Amino acid sequence: MISIYTQPTLAQAWLQKYQGSCPIFALILGYTQTGLIPGISAAGATPQDRQYTAIADAEFLVKGCVKTPQYPLPPLNVGVSPVYISRAVIEAFNIPIYLFNAGLPDPPSVPFIDLEGIPAHCLSSGQALPLDKVYHLYTQGVKWGEKLALIAPKSYLMIGECVVGGTTTALAVLRGLGVDAAGKVNSSHPQCNHAQKWSVVQLGLQKLGTLSDIDPFRLVAAVGDPMQIVAAGMAIAASRTIGVMLAGGTQMLAVYALIKSIISHFQERANLSQLVVGTTRWVAEDKSGDTIGLAQLIPNVPLLATQLNLNQSRYPQLQVYEQGYVKEGVGAGGCAIASYLYQGWTQQQLLNAIESLIAQSVEIKIEHNS
């Protein structure tokens, strides 16, 4: 159920250490106006929908299927939200969830921890976030990383994200850190919109001027999003005492690169042997990107992925994942990995749990329309 794509020795040691452990899950919600660019993301049918994607995902993650959600999951052009995968695992194993608002236009409808962040401007402006806000969010991330490590002293922390447009800010941060990520990132589209992403990134980076040995905080302030810096601080602090899985694809590879830059620039203490990136097979083997090649450009990052396959699902909304739609989000890959690592779940057990949630949603929709 789990494949290792890079740094097999480090990854295998991490998996062995945390086999049988129940993780805790920190989901960091953020927002960037980059997500409003037409066509930049498929996580929400329209730019208007995308403003509420993270809030709707958070509500479903915590509450599951309810008859009258305050924020219904946005209509995706093709495929259901990856939060169905995350929720299936969270519900089955009662994994503790900590929701963090790093900077949303509106507050979530379920209990959350407010980090006093703000939504990011479009990265093309070269002024995504005020620098003092970036420092504040990093400090908050470190503080909560330390707190969460005390809650799970012999286990690991999964850090997930929900940021529409986040693979584009990830590309910008990676490129700013000197990683040649152009053409290698993923997106929620079946064929990644590399040219569009790259043109937006170039606009933002040009306004920064020289990129040689750039201060990572200044880089995030210019072209990043609020989730990235919180996740970096949280992972750095938690890694000192417990395991950390950055649960995501391109966005979490960018966070890993950011972590390395922060450690290098500011001599922050961290234990990178405790840190892995966990995603889905649809991201790791995405032929319209090059996730494995990207991971290999970031020294020593262990990349794992669930081998969950949805071809045999009875729901077309799940089968389309095998055609390249959606791929990842809300820690879906990490949660699928956790289901195997904690309780040895098979492919069929996980599929049954996901389909059970979809069946509930379909039933509620039929009742609502009748």
Swiss-Prot record:
Top-level lineage group: Bacteria
GO MF: nicotinate-nucleotide-dimethylbenzimidazole phosphoribosyltransferase activity
InterPro entries named in the record: Nict_dMeBzImd_PRibTrfase, Nict_dMeBzImd_PRibTrfase_arc, Nict_dMeBzImd_PRibTrfase_sf
HAMAP family xrefs: UPF0284 (MF_01086)
Family to which the UniProt record says this protein belongs: Belongs to the UPF0284 family.
Listed name of the protein: UPF0284 protein PCC7424_2681
Native organism: Gloeothece citriformis (strain PCC 7424)
Phylogenetic placement of the source organism: Bacteria, Bacillati, Cyanobacteriota, Cyanophyceae, Oscillatoriophycideae
